[in-house]
Amino acid sequence: MDDPAYEDIIDEAILYFRPNVFFRNFEIKGPADRTLIYLFLYITECLKRILQQKIVQKLQASKELTTLALDSRRGFPIPGEQAFPFPSLFKPPANAQEDETMRAYLQQLRQEMGVRLIERVFPNSDGMPSKWWLCFAKRRFMDKQLTHTI
């Protein structure tokens, strides 16, 4: 959106990630909170990727996070799959069409999160990542992770 006053779920996840990453519990008041949980876990995956790959340039980070979001070999699990970290919080897809729709939606969330997160992690013109943001790469929200390998 062009309106700086407009805040969507991605902006909200970035804003509330740091204070919430320290908690093992998260009160779910509605469907948006479930999406926030997924995005918090994905932010952690992004930060781990930047830290582990020793990425020090914004362009390189952009390429890495785009690859991470789109990489089908990573097989980001969706609700209903055994590896999904919160099986009881999300309703699994009822059929193949819902499965495909959910995969596409979550992939779009991951792509947009990567784009916006890079702007926060690489805030300065020197191109170096914010150590303050990267320190959260080692934290695990609710003691869970979205994937098992990075």
Show where each model-derived region lies.
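Surface/interface-facing alpha-helical segments and adjacent flexible terminal/loop regions used
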Residues: 1-150
